[in-house]
């Protein structure tokens, strides 16, 4: 019945704190309300657009028993090759880590926007959220309490992607900052989660240990080239692994406008791969410089 919409939280609270994060902003919002004041909370970014019946569909899912819901986020600005490749990457993630996971009985991965939660439950966990990445902070709390996240592909949430290599690199830097923290968290908690039989939790922690798509492709390609030079008989498995990964990603790419434009934008893929690699080195360099 009653739903609290939260949009552009960082813009609202950025003046109250020098380095405002979504986690801080959402905590400030939730402090204003009592646990039973609303039925649901729906979180969007300030630039998001949704289909007209989005709230109706979310309401139906909520009253069907879903306490945590992730909508289908799609890229709106397919204006450059970089934006098209970023959009293709997000659709691959949607099919593997959201649609694919729910088909296997695991929770959908959260995205940080286009999310809906039971208000009382979210009010309870919001003070305990930590870190700068809202999606990862919420995911870890939900999985600790065995709360399942449903993925609703029919609820389209349009967002804007970086349309230049420089913008993509800056976005990767922010993602890496949260990813490194998640990796160390996964290394600490995965053994205990495995012994406790929390398979949904284990699946998420293992996922956080994996490198990004572009870095994975780059590492396997470099390994294949090195072994080809040193001993070509040892390189076959690397080429087979590279082929299998590429086929997997292509199978996860849906039909539609993104698929059509991807064929013409694939030439920019090496640029994004190098941008991803440089983002990692940039992160390491800044950490080393800061420690000095």
PLM regions and their residue ranges:
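Membrane-embedded multi-pass helical conduit in multi-pass membrane proteins
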Residues: 207-287
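Long helical/loop segments within the catalytic core of UDP-sugar-dependent glycosyltransferases
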Residues: 15, 19-38, 53, 57-131, ...
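Nucleotide-sugar-dependent glycosyltransferase catalytic core
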Residues: 161-177, 261-262
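Catalytic donor-sugar/metal-binding loop of nucleotide-sugar-dependent glycosyltransferases
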Residues: 139-158
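Acidic donor-binding loop at a coil-to-helix junction in glycosyltransferase catalytic cores
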Residues: 131-138
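Catalytic core of nucleotide-sugar-dependent glycosyltransferases
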Residues: 91-95, 169-190, 219, 275-283
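Single conserved hydrophobic/aromatic residue that forms the stacking wall/gate
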Residues: 2-13
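Short beta-strand-to-loop acidic/aromatic patch adjacent to the donor-nucleotide binding site
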Residues: 36-49
């Amino acid at each position: 019945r009653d739903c609290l919409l939260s949009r552009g939280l960082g813009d609202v609270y950025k003046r109250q704190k020098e380095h405002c994060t979504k986690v801080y902003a959402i905590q400030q919002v939730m402090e204003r309300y009592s646990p039973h004041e609303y039925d649901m909370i729906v979180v969007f970014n300030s630039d998001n657009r949704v289909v007209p019946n989005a709230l109706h569909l979310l309401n139906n899912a909520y009253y069907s028993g879903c306490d945590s819901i992730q909508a289908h986020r799609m890229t709106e600005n397919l204006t450059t090759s970089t934006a098209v490749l970023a959009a293709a990457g997000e659709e691959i993630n949607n099919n593997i880590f959201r649609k694919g996971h729910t088909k296997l009985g695991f929770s959908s991965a959260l995205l940080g926007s286009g999310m809906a939660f039971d208000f009382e439950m979210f009010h309870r966990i919001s003070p305990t959220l930590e870190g700068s990445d809202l999606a990862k902070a919420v995911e870890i709390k939900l999985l600790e309490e065995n709360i399942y996240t449903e993925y609703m592909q029919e609820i389209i949430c349009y967002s804007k992607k970086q349309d230049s290599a420089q913008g993509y690199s800056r976005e990767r830097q922010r993602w890496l900052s949260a990813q490194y923290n998640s990796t160390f968290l996964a290394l600490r908690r995965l053994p205990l989660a495995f012994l406790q039989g929390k398979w949904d939790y284990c699946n998420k922690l293992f996922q956080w240990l994996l490198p990004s798509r572009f870095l994975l492709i780059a590492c396997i390609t470099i390994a294949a080239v090195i072994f080809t030079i040193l001993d070509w008989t040892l390189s076959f498995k690397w080429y087979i692994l590279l082929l299998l990964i590429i086929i997997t990603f292509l199978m996860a790419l849906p039909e539609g406008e993104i698929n059509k434009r991807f064929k013409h934008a694939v030439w920019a893929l090496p640029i994004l791969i190098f941008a991803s690699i440089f983002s990692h080195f940039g992160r390491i360099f800044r950490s080393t410089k800061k420690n000095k």
